[in-house]
Amino acid sequence: MLLSALFQRYVPAAFADACAALRYAWDNAAALGIDRMRLAVGGDSAGGALAAGCAQWARDCAGIGLCFQLLLYPVTDCRMQTDSMRRGRDTPLWNARLNRRMWRLYLRGGAGDHPSWAAPMLAERFDGLPPAYVEVEQFDCLHDEGIDYAAALQAAGVSVQVEDVRGTFHGFDVFRKADLVKKQIEARSRALRTAFEKGA
């Protein structure tokens, strides 16, 4: 079963909506036919930030056990200081200029005192989080912050599968008929299947 929230507002509204969806799934697992041992979060781009933030929230505040997090070219760091961000002013579909504008609008001016769920890389600790699949794209301004987040998870003892996909860009998977897209969708599906089988 896939549950998704519709996001249309500033921080923290999208995060609150995502957490509410996760809480609903956890609290109503029996009625929904959901196995709590096989509950995962996932998202791409800004949705990857929300998924990673939800995983942190589930660990710290909610008493919800997740079996997996699927993070596809995720936004993780509002500081935007990586090499790929500096190189990525004109990357296809998404670039550093748009990313800077997004953070300014989302955070309404700056990072301020927003907790790490707004920018998961700001977390004080990464231990105790669920295993992760982190996919990054070669020509994406977000490439390095995805790699950095995966490295932070691994350093904390979290099992992480990193897919650093060559020849791709942010949102490349909109081209559903392309062979490479099909290959990556299968890799993502395989990672989820493996996680769900372990949680069974």
Language-model region placement:
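Alpha/beta-hydrolase superfamily serine-hydrolase fold, recognizing
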Residues: 1-200
